[in-house]
Curated annotation (Swiss-Prot):
This is Beta-1,2-xylosyltransferase RCN11. Its EC number is 2.4.2.-. Disruption phenotype: Reduced number of tillers and reduced biomass. Glycans are attached at residues 307, 313. Keywords: Glycoprotein, Glycosyltransferase, Golgi apparatus, Membrane, Signal-anchor, Stress response, Transferase, Transmembrane, Transmembrane helix.
């Protein structure tokens, strides 16, 4: 009987072992899986980045500094942190967008159309190279031989408002009437700009020879970007004393003629190009390094970019993880085209994708779309309904309004009988077979979204030579232009913009500033025939 009992006992023992194993194995597997999951999560957190930083060497240590800017990088806050997703606005999808930087895109030839409007900033000059092992700042410039200007950028860059002599900026207009323009433009003391070196290097950031080669004055009386670079100093590691850190990429911009739409659009274009050439993943912040008072156009800066402030609003020295110095508006193709002759015409991005041509450009259309998208106007429903209710003839008016502290509130008349011409067109339109809506473009009394919508919906834009016509950068490709030009203002601004946008352009050149109503109506009538009217 014993063998039988032994057999039964052994069988029972095996059963209990199997039972225990069946309980233990899942637990072991679960524990192994949990350890693996935790270590994988830790790995992800350690390597997480919401978007590729364009310059990984800019600041590898990533000091634990609040994204809003608090802390001077000392004491308890110096701990490694997980980078938060960007708070900056993403780039909108633009139908006319063409790549600015990519291995497959070769730099455009010097003095070509794309060299003027696109990424002709093809010469990279390393002023302060980033250290391979990390640590320290960096500084470099992208130079355009075509425009004879540079877009400069750096990491661990300090700007000290206390070393910039100018007005505070951003004040209400009525508080600063009569203030001289010189007071509003920056004068820098040495060290106003500082960049932290990776090694114990000190001294000027750049020499005079560098400035002459890469940031020449080019006939600009007060070249503030050159002056800012001239004030630049390199400081050793740990010597960059900051009251505040700005984590996000930031454009440093100095505006001239900031209340004038034409000059402001040159500033917007320069800021847009600077953002694309430096390959920013999102729309940057903007710091105005000027002391101009509040102006209506500031709202459009805020719509185009992520955040806008004045440098004098910072309470002390402010440091940037990534700062970009945007060239002056005077250095853009929009301005240089007034005095330099170059072959360039507008084309659709679609045609340039199929057949690249450096003597054609879609960049102004891309930029116009950027402005529209910033006001949520780049919508198919707006474009598809453009002519559903008749043809819009937009008459861009010049009217009196107080623009800046040195302004009388009166605008020079470029068309002495503007009201007579407007009334005559309105009367004539009512008698036509096809439906023509004459739109009274009192732009100085319309907000930017209303102005852009009026331009977008216009089949014909008509007006005396004046800054309001610069909105043509946002016109749709089928828009036709009629400019009435007095003998005192025979300048090519809007003929050129129309050409660079490939818009059909017509002009009436007046012997003085008085237009014969019949001449204007005859010209307008001929233009409308092109719409089958």
């Amino acid at each position: 009987m014993m063998p039988v009992r032994t057999y039964h006992h052994h069988h029972h023992h095996n059963n209990s072992n199997n039972h225990r194993l069946r309980r233990i194995i899942p637990r072991v597997l679960l524990a192994v899986f949990a350890i693996y999951a935790v270590s994988f999560a830790a790995y992800l957190l350690r390597h997480q980045s919401p978007h590729p930083h364009p310059h990984p060497a800019a600041d590898p240590e990533r000091d634990a500094v609040d994204a809003a800017g608090g802390g001077g990088g000392g004491g308890a806050v110096d701990r490694v942190r997980v980078e938060a997703p960007s708070s900056q606005k993403p780039w909108p999808r633009l139908p006319s967008f063409l790549p600015w930087t990519s291995a497959s895109v070769r730099p455009p030839p010097k003095h070509s159309c794309e060299g003027y409007f696109g990424n002709g900033f093809s010469r990279l000059v390393d002023v302060l190279p980033a250290r391979g092992g990390g640590g320290g700042g960096w500084f470099r410039c992208h130079h355009s031989e075509t425009l004879r200007s540079s877009i400069c950028e750096g990491g661990r860059v300090r700007l000290d408002p206390g070393l910039i002599a100018m007005s505070r900026g951003g004040e209400p207009l009525d508080q600063v009437m009569g203030r001289a323009e010189e007071e509003e433009l920056p004068k820098y003391e040495p060290g106003a700009l500082q960049v932290e070196a990776a090694a114990k290097r000190t001294g000027p950031l750049v020499e005079a020879g560098f400035l002459d080669a890469y940031v020449p004055t080019g006939g600009i009386g007060m070249h503030t970007m050159r002056s800012l670079l001239d004030s630049g100093r390199v400081v050793p590691p740990g010597e960059l004393h900051c009251s505040q850190w700005v984590e996000e990429p930031t454009l440093l911009v100095t505006r001239f003629e900031y209340a004038n739409l034409f000059h402001t659009i040159t500033d917007w274009y320069s800021a847009y190009v600077s953002s694309r050439v430096t390959d920013l993943p999102n729309r940057p912040n903007v710091v105005f390094v000027d002391g101009h008072c509040k102006a209506q156009l500031e709202q459009t800066w805020e719509a185009l970019f992520s955040n806008v402030t004045y440098v004098k609003n910072f309470s002390g020295p402010v440091c940037f993880r990534h700062a970009i110095l945007s060239p002056l508006g005077y250095e853009t193709a929009l301005f240089k085209g007034l005095s330099e002759s170059f072959s360039c015409e507008g084309a659709s991005a679609e045609s340039l994708r199929e057949k690249p041509d450096h003597q054609k450009t879609a960049r102004l259309s891309e930029f116009g779309e950027m402005i529209l998208a910033s006001f949520d106007l780049l919508r198919d429903d707006i474009l598809s309904s453009k002519t559903s209710n008749g043809l819009n003839v937009l008459f861009v008016r010049r009217e009196d309004y107080l623009a800046h502290p040195r302004h009388s509130g009166k605008v020079e008349s470029r068309l002495s009988n503007e009201k007579e011409v407007y009334d005559a067109i309105e009367g004539w339109a009512k008698g036509q077979k096809c439906k023509i809506n004459v739109i009274n473009g009192l732009f100085a009394h319309m907000n930017m979204k209303e102005q852009l919508r009026a331009i977008q919906e216009a089949s014909v834009v008509i007006g005396a030579h004046g800054a309001g016509l610069t909105h043509l950068v946002s016109a749709t490709p089928d828009t036709k232009v009629l400019e009435i030009i007095s003998s005192m203002y025979r300048r090519p601004h809007f003929a050129l913009i129309s050409h660079w946008k490939s818009l059909e352009y017509h002009a009436i050149n007046l012997p003085g500033s008085y237009a014969r109503v019949t001449d204007v109506i005859n010209e307008l009538s001929n233009i409308l025939k092109g719409f089958g009217c």
